[in-house]
UniProtKB/Swiss-Prot annotation:
Residue ranges with Basic residues bias: 111-124
InterPro entries: NA-bd_OB-fold (IPR012340), Ribosomal_uS12 (IPR006032), Ribosomal_uS12_bac (IPR005679)
Organism of provenance: Solibacter usitatus (strain Ellin6076)
Single biological process term from Gene Ontology: translation
Entry GO MF terms: rRNA binding; structural constituent of ribosome; tRNA binding
Assigned protein family: Belongs to the universal ribosomal protein uS12 family.
Keyword presence, Ribonucleoprotein: yes
Residue ranges of the region described as Disordered: 1-25, 104-124
Subunit structure: Part of the 30S ribosomal subunit. Contacts proteins S8 and S17. May interact with IF1 in the 30S initiation complex.
Record-given protein name: Small ribosomal subunit protein uS12
HAMAP family linked: Ribosomal_uS12_B
Keyword tags: Methylation, Ribonucleoprotein, Ribosomal protein, RNA-binding, rRNA-binding, tRNA-binding
Residue positions, PTM 3-methylthioaspartic acid: 89
Gene of this entry: rpsL
Amino acid sequence: MPTFNQLVRNGRKPPRWKTSSPALESCPQKRGVCTRVYTSTPKKPNSALRKVARVRLTNGIEVTTYIPGVGHNLQEHSIVLIRGGRVKDLPGVRYHVIRGALDTAGVANRKQSRSKYGAKRPKS
């Protein structure tokens, strides 16, 4: 417990909140270039080959991003738009690629939740 004089000298500092996506620098999205596109295996109870990409952002930071949806057209040097949002079973993956923006194609034959995967409305 500080003394009254210590509080007069220094005061109480409000707690500083830590962001869960620091590379975005308080922006909603950031653009970047894929430096590597590969698959990764998830943590213990799950088993799969998750599609991830290493992306160098316009601010120079390099991050690992998850590519959602079935199938993708990304390769090295593709320009992508990323957003925040971690993948719970992939350690170190704190960002998502936005499907249907820039070089990333939307998911083909997607009927439901289309807006999340950049899929156009099918011709009825």
